[in-house]
Swiss-Prot record:
Predominant location category: membrane
Cellular compartment(s): Cell outer membrane
NCBIfam families: TonB-siderophor
Name of this chain's protein: Ferrioxamine receptor
Pfam family, one: TonB_dep_Rec_b-barrel
Domain TBDR beta-barrel: 181-710
Superkingdom of origin: Bacteria
Gene name for this UniProt entry: foxA
Length: 710
């Protein structure tokens, strides 16, 4: 039934999109007078963005933003030919994306050492991407649809409500433009990778513009018996009747018939001991399914009443279905001859809605300029699911012999069967927030506060039980920045975050919310007249009432407090007309405090103490552009008890692009490009959740692209 629904809805939208270019052709001449939206929504150029909307929900120059913000531009994503948001963030300081190694099913991002709720810190076009991190129903946006990615570091609850303390990842979709622009790509690579993508935008009339973007991806993976398959399309329509009013309608339709692999191997077999193959498959072919169908419909409305008052409203509706069957290992048995294995199954349907209303006023009191923002937002999701669990026959990973694929309802493997529960997981949040950005000469003071009401509910229809929790919480943020005429802007800030109890404990009771606070000092430098941007930030961040996932189980356990202290350095520089550089360094000291599980003073998993990266893009002449990068991830712990370290690793990437129009005028706009990641094909462990659950890093990837820009 759902397949019929998505096909029918997609057919309607695609039919409308196909009609739009015909309408534009019907007008011989179109004089465009409407202006585009906020500057931070406009297409980026090169490797450096100059503004951000994510930090304050208003257009704000980065040089005047008293917070550490990194922006990944469209140019960077194209040059590096990224296939996931995780991959797009590989060269961003303060960000660790190695959670699942070569697996690409989810975009899981740790910021400043915090990964709890790691799929709940992503936003699309200003609204939270409403996934259910307590299930397998988690959304993923293809980076081909994105114009930019802003990483807002540090607690952000004063504007966004619930968030992890390390920050949020703000994805901005490509918008319709009133000028004609098109892109077409064909990519082929190892693991039978095949990608076809297109993107076209144009004006229909003086006040209407459209955009149609689509992509299909198909490939094998580095893992045996695994494939990835995706079909996605994103039509959008923009109406601007005058320079003060705009309405943008969007849809993002995505079908993933095969979501590839998402499992791991023990540390004994990857970090040490008899090493397993990177392609090792711990499952069973007759229980190996991951399908995801997601639809996101949204709109953005804005109106400027006069020179003082303006209003904005963003809203989205999301529907996502996920089907999963997976047999996976959970560590060695007592004599290390066989791997214990488990089974998980899920059939879930998620519906979500979010809306954000913003009233902005540009005022002046005496010599002080004020930009005041008053907002009211609401979000909710409901995920109805059938959750299956069982024990599977153990596996000898070196011979591939498991003794069969029978599933058992008991750990003694005596009773064939599956344990099934019918669940409903619900969450809603409503909040009101107020922000005042004050400017007096070169001083910039920002004060913001928010009050939230959050309700979580877990219903087990099988056990006829309900666990419900309601929390009210106030969050705040304050920052002060001084902007020197030389382009130097030092700042200091304080911010808070609330992370609600979406996660159950071992008894399926909801845990209490986690609260956080951060102190940050930093400096931003932008040479006058330059687009280059340099920044440094020092922070001290503490999260209380921490909950960690008990991998490979799906419940969470209390772990006390976590304190993160660190330094982030970033440079995005246009060194010359031909050379662009992105450089970053992260030092992150993360420790458990007041831990109740014996780990006090230890470092959590997924928190490398040092990370560094460098990417350089050089225009060599004759239409040749060469890019090269190096990424270093320092040592990290394989378990919270700190009994074993994950070794550090260094990876190299490269790209070469040839613009064919330089050699033949008839080929203007055409190009060929080669991208190689992990050039040395280094075999490494990217990260571990525990000593039983470590992820092999991605193998070497070689992809060749033929493209045409017009």
């Amino acid at each position: 039934m759902f397949s019929a629904f998505i096909i029918k809805r997609s057919a309607i939208l695609c039919s409308l999109a196909m009609f739009i270019p015909l309408a534009s052709i019907a007008d011989d001449t179109i004089e465009v007078t409407a202006k585009a939206g906020h500057e931070a929504d406009l297409p980026t150029s090169g490797y450096t963005a100059t503004t951000t909307k994510g930090a304050t929900k208003t257009d704000q120059p980065l040089i005047l933003t008293a917070q550490s913000v990194s922006v990944v531009t469209r140019q960077q994503m194209d040059d590096q030919n990224v296939a996931t948001v995780n991959q797009a963030l590989n060269y961003t300081p303060g960000v660790f994306t190695g959670f699942s190694g070569g697996a690409t099913r989810y975009d899981t991002v740790a910021l400043r050492g915090f990964h709890g709720g790691d799929v709940n810190n992503t936003f699309l076009d200003g609204l939270r991407l409403l996934s259910d991190g307590g299930s397998y129903n988690v959304l993923q946006v293809d980076p081909w649809f994105l114009e930019r990615i802003d990483v807002i570091k540090g607690p952000s609850s004063a504007l966004y409500g619930q968030s992890i303390p390390g920050g949020v990842v703000m994805m901005t979709s490509k918008r319709p433009q009133f000028t004609s622009e098109g892109h077409f790509r064909l990519t082929a690579g190892n693991n039978n990778t095949q990608v076809a993508a297109f993107d076209y935008t144009d004006a229909i009339s003086e006040h209407w513009a459209f955009r149609l973007t689509g992509i299909t991806r198909n490939s094998d993976t580095m893992y045996d018996h695994q494939r990835e398959e995706r079909y996605a399309i994103a039509p959008s329509l923009l109406w601007q009747p005058d320079e003060n009013t705009s309405l943008l309608l969007r849809a993002n339709l995505q079908k993933d018939p095969s979501g590839g692999y998402h499992s791991a191997v023990p540390a004994d077999g990857s970090i040490y001991g008899q090493k397993l193959s990177r392609g090792f498959f711990d499952g069973e072919s007759n229980h190996n399914v991951f399908k995801r169908w997601q639809q996101i419909y949204s709109y953005e409305f804005s109106h400027k009443f006069d020179d003082v008052w303006s209003f904005r409203q963003n809203a989205s509706y999301t529907h996502s279905n996920t089907q999963l069957e997976q047999v996976y290992q959970g560590g060695w048995n007592s004599d290390r001859t066989l791997m214990n294995r488990y089974y998980s199954g899920e059939d879930s349907s998620l519906n979500a809605f979010a809306v954000d209303n913003q009233l902005e006023a540009d005022l002046r009191t005496a010599a002080v300029k004020h930009k005041v923002l008053l907002g009211v937002d609401f979000q909710k999701f409901r995920n109805n699911l059938r959750s299956d669990s069982a024990y599977a026959t153990p596996l000898n990973p070196y011979t591939g012999v498991s003794g069969g694929s029978t599933l058992y309802s008991d750990y003694l493997l005596t009773t064939p069967g599956i344990n099934t529960s019918y669940l409903s997981r619900r969450y809603e949040q409503s909040g009101v927030y107020l922000q005042d950005e004050m400017t007096l000469d070169n001083w910039h003071l920002n004060l913001s506060g928010r009050y939230d009401r959050m309700k979580t509910e877990n219903i087990n229809n099988t056990a006829n039980s309900t666990d419900e929790r309601t929390d009210n919480h106030a969050s705040g943020r304050a920052s002060l920045l001084y902007s020197f005429d030389s382009g130097i802007s030092p700042y200091v800030s304080y911010s808070q975050a609330i992370t609600p109890s979406l996660f159950p404990d071992a008894q399926q009771k909801l845990l209490k919310p986690m609260t956080s606070e951060q102190y940050e000092v930093g400096i931003i430098y932008q040479p006058p007249g330059s687009t280059s941007l340099y920044s440094a930030a020092l922070y001290d961040l503490t999260q209380n009432d921490v909950a960690n996932r008990a991998v490979p189980a799906t419940y969470y356990v209390p772990a006390g407090k976590v304190n993160s202290q660190g330094l982030e350095l970033e440079a995005r520089s246009q060194i010359s007309d031909r050379l662009s550089v992105i450089a970053g360094y992260t030092y992150n000291r993360v420790k458990f405090k007041d831990a109740i599980d014996g780990n006090d003073g230890n470092t959590p998993v997924l928190a490398p103490s040092n990370m560094a990266s460098l990417w350089a893009q050089y225009e060599a002449g004759y239409g040749i552009n060469v890019g090269a990068g190096i990424r270093y991830i320092g040592k990290q712990w394989a378990d919270d008890a700190n009994t074993l370290r994950v070794p550090s690793y260094t990876l190299g990437d490269a790209s070469v692009r040839a613009d064919l129009g330089t050699w033949a005028a008839s080929l203007k706009g055409a190009f060929v490009q080669l991208n190689v990641n992990n050039i040395a094909d280094k075999k490494y462990v990217a990260a571990c959740y525990s000593t039983s659950y470590c992820y092999w890093g991605a193998e070497r990837s070689v992809q060749a692209t033929v493209g045409y820009d017009f």
